[in-house]
Regions:
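A short coil-to-beta-strand element that immediately follows conserved catalytic motifs
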Residues: 86-98
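Conserved Nudix-box catalytic region and its N-terminal flanking loop in Nudix hydrolases
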Residues: 20-22, 29, 42-86
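A structural signal for well-ordered alpha-helical scaffolds and beta->alpha junctions
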Residues: 72-76, 112, 116, 156, ...
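Nudix hydrolase/Nudix homology domain
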Residues: 1-5, 24-26, 53-67, 126-171
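A short catalytic or substrate-binding loop motif that flags glycine-/basic-rich loops and adjacent residues
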Residues: 28-33, 41, 111-113
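Acidic, metal-coordinating catalytic segment for phosphate/diphosphate chemistry
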Residues: 4-35
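Active-site-adjacent beta-strand/loop module that shapes the phosphate/pyrophosphate-binding cleft
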Residues: 98-132
């Protein structure tokens, strides 16, 4: 009973009005994007492709599915289709999930919230097209870069330092 009276008095003192409600809703409006990242390594370099929307080279990625099994299935199809490697020639291993808040290059610097799921792709048979430092497969311009090269690249470092650091720290 005491708790009920105390709650009533507190509610009367701290009125919750339309302005406060609007501010609370505005603060909750976090535009999130969930992306699954595929890290493919050959010796000490990682596979990147030219992401036209972001204007920089980036790891292969796809929108994250709701379940891990579905995510792996979708990523396998995406990676095989878009990068010209048969699904039987690689396996994906879940590594970690990381949240990030940063300005979006695609949305004029608007701060966006990201959740990245990192996968390692273990390639058993390297496609011939992938044997060059830079190559074109399907509609993708691809290249191999070391983590140090990525961090030294001003565009990659500015736009995706968080993702490069996640790969560096977890693989």
């Amino acid at each position: 009973m005491f708790y009920g009276v105390w709650s009533l008095i507190t509610a009367c003192r701290n009125k919750y009005d339309a302005i406060t409600l609007y501010e609370d809703v505005a603060n909750m409006d976090r535009t999130e994007r969930r992306s699954s990242i595929i890290a493919v390594k050959d010796a000490n370099r990682y596979l990147l492709y030219r992401d036209l929307g972001w204007g920089c080279d980036f790891f292969p990625n796809h929108a994250t599915a709701s379940s891990t099994d579905e995510d792996v299935r979708q990523l396998t199809t995406y990676f095989a289709d878009e990068f010209g490697i048969p699904a039987k020639d690689f396996t994906l291993s879940h590594i970690c999930v990381k949240d990030s808040e940063k300005p979006s290059a695609e949305h004029d610097g608007e701060v966006r919230y990201y959740e990245y799921t990192l996968y390692r792709a273990s390639v058993t048979v390297m496609p011939d097209a992938w044997r060059s430092t830079e190559f074109h497969v399907g509609a993708k311009d691809c290249r191999w870069m070391t983590l140090d090269e990525m961090l030294a690249d001003p565009v990659i470092n500015k736009i995706n330092h968080d993702v490069v650091a996640m790969v560096r720290d977890n693989l």
